[in-house]
Structure formats: structure tokens, C-alpha cells
């Protein structure tokens, strides 16, 4: 029996029907979990991501996958092809190992001139696989909002994407493994050999990634910091304080990648069916929030029933996709008029920015990337799903529905902290104009325009909000 299984199964037997969960708020812990679990793998690694960057953390994890394969682990790597430019040579090398297989979701035929693909095959290539999972030996899995890259793990000099994953053991791991297999064998996925020329006959022990990937000072500093983290010590010696709760996986039908999924099978519909009608409160944290007319109507129906709704999303200054902000900005006044609380994450913070990671709601220079919400302080969703039309209708998504007051209280606590420390609260003045209120200072500071943005950026967003492109956002 693999050592991970021998450590996990006795714990699970003490909590029948429940899953052991550890929320990965801190970016360093999120990287450490993936890196160390890859080192601990003995039989299988099933890895599925929307983005895998060719940067320090991406290369370290590529190296960890190759090292696992050299130990005899079967590695299956499933990537969305929209974000693989520049990775073809690395993927070829990995796929040439007999125990590594790489597959691509909705691959591009034109490798060098990818925009041509959108001209000739738009309806297919506009549908992407946004799922994110990392499953080890069939007994431990990580699911959440993070892709693979320095911006998600606080590993480089880029601004941090503040995010949330959850590490899970228990029955839901088998569900994630089965879901991975559904995607692995679906019609939208192609083996790398069908997309690229992959060399054959390589000796497994001769396949090497560049040594320079591990020899620079920044990489050494980051790995030392990881090794000294309390999380790593708890992970290795099996003393992580797990939250035990009933957990359900929700994942889109892979046929969504072909535009053939039934509407009732789409993740948001199933999500709201499972979570039922809130009676008291919903706290939503979403990097991209484009509610649409139908979504706004649904939110307002809940408000009229006495449900308190609070939403935290990126400000225009913090949003890494400014045009998406247009699909949200057009609905702000209506939501505020009906009593929905809106908070927008600041792009910077007053305190020091020295590698200080505040988890879900960010640190200095952070952009919100988490996708989570809690209902009535009892139920939580953590996953890849953004509250926008693209996640609803075009991209495939996944996530966990968790029945845990402990986890819901954690989300609520972080939300409340962000309201005062990391975000502007939006309010309407007596003339119905939006004000941005900074409550971090001793005295409230009221701003009359989109904070920390230029005139031309505001004009661009205003123009984008007029265009009929909401369904693409």
C-alpha cells in the first residue's frame, strides 16, 4: 500500500461519509502542497490545469512530475491548449517519457499563428477547460482556483493572484479521479502526439529538463522558504488540522467543450439546486463578477426575501482583464439601490509588500483570483467557477460544495477583514452616483471616481459596457 494511502485511510475510517479538508489560503502553502505531494507520489499523478506558466514555479512542478515518472509513477497531464504558447518543446520532452502522457483540451491546429485558429474555428476554440485539480495516488486531491505560475504562488516578482484551494482526502477524491478520466477520454481532448511531433525511443533515464531551471538564487531562496514553512512540517508528519465535512464534487460535463452539454447539467444550475434557497446571508468572493440581467434578477429576488448579499470582486485598478470589468460595472448602481453590498479589492495596500501573504483576499499588489462563496454560515463552494457568462456557458468548471460551519466562518472572517483592510466599499450618494469609500484609515475617505485608474482606462471600460459582448466575458 502506498505510504500516502496508509496514512490517509485510517483517518478516513474514523469519519465515514466525510472528507478531511485543509484550506490552502497562503500561496506558498499552495505551491508546497503540490510540490511535496508530487515528491511523495508512488503510483499515479493526475494533473489538470487551465494555465501552466513557463516560469520558476511552473518549471519546478514540471521537474517534480518528471522526477515522479523516473521513480515509476504514472503521470497524466491534461492542459487547456489556450495557454500553452512557448511550452511545445517542454511538453514534447515530458511526453517522450514512457510513464508520462500529455493531452490537450481543444488544441490549436496553428501552433505559431494561433489567432488564425479563432478565425477558422472560433466556436470550438472559444470553449476552454477552466478546471484545476491535482490528484496523487488516488487518495489526496487539490481543487480550487489556482493555476500553475509564479503569480499564483508568490514565487516571482509579479503581483500576486490572491486565491483559494482546498486539499482533500476521503470519498470525494475518487469522484475527482473519475471526473479526470471523463475529461481524459472526452472528444475535446487530444493526445500530444496528434498535435505535435513527439520523439520516440528516448531512454527514460536520459530525459532531462534544463539544469539552469534550479540553479538560480531566486529558486533556491523560494525552496528554502518552502521547506521552512510550518505547513510542510505538518504535511510530512501527518499533523495537519483537517476539517471533516460532507463534501460533494460538482463538475461540468466535458461535452460542454463541444457545445453539446445539456443546460440542466451545467455547473451553476446544479450548484444552486444543491445549495437551495439561502435564508439569511450570501458572501460571494469572485475575481470576475459579471452577473448579467438574469443573475441580477435572481440576486434581487433573494434580497426581497430578506437575504443579505455581499460581494467582493476586483476593482478596475486590480482587475487583470479590464474589459471584463465593463460587464460588472453596468450593474453596480442597480445592485446598490436594492441593498446588495459591493466591495472592490484595492490594487495596493498601505502596509509593507514584503512577501506578506494574506490568503484569499490578498496582499500588497494583489489581484483577486479566488472563486468562493458561503451561504448562511453553513455551506461553502470552492472551485474554478467565476460568476460570469463564460464560466456559465462556455468554459468547463469544477469545484467542491462543502457543508462546514467551520469553513464558512473562515470565509466570512476573511471577507469581513477585507472590507476594512483591502477593499473599497461602494455606496450611492444622494444624487445616485457611486462613491468608493476607504475605511482602512481612521476617518473614511470618499472617492468620486474609479480609484487608481486613468481617464482613458475609464473611457475604455465605459465603451466596452455598451458593446453586446457580455456573453463572451
UniProtKB/Swiss-Prot annotation:
Phenotype caused by lack of the gene: Triple deletion of clsA, clsB and clsC results in a complete lack of cardiolipin, regardless of growth phase or growth conditions.
Chemical reaction(s) catalysed: a 1,2-diacyl-sn-glycero-3-phospho-(1'-sn-glycerol) + a 1,2-diacyl-sn-glycero-3-phosphoethanolamine = a cardiolipin + ethanolamine
Active site: 130, 132, 137, 369, 371, 376
One GO BP: cardiolipin biosynthetic process
Molecular-function annotations in GO: phosphatidylglycerol-phosphatidylethanolamine phosphatidyltransferase activity
Keyword Repeat appears in the UniProt entry: yes
InterPro entries on file: Cardiolipin_synth_ClsC (IPR030871), PLD-like_dom (IPR025202), PLipase_D/transphosphatidylase (IPR001736)
PROSITE patterns, per database record: PLD
EC number(s) reported in the record: 2.7.8.-
Keyword tags: Lipid biosynthesis, Lipid metabolism, Phospholipid biosynthesis, Phospholipid metabolism, Repeat, Transferase
Boundaries of every PLD phosphodiesterase domain copy: 125-152, 364-391
Any Pfam family: PLDc_2
Family from the record: Belongs to the phospholipase D family. Cardiolipin synthase subfamily. ClsC sub-subfamily.
Function, in words: Catalyzes the synthesis of cardiolipin (CL) (diphosphatidylglycerol) from phosphatidylglycerol (PG) and phosphatidylethanolamine (PE).
HAMAP family, alphabetized: Cardiolipin_synth_ClsC
Protein's recorded name: Cardiolipin synthase C
UniProt source species: Escherichia coli (strain K12)
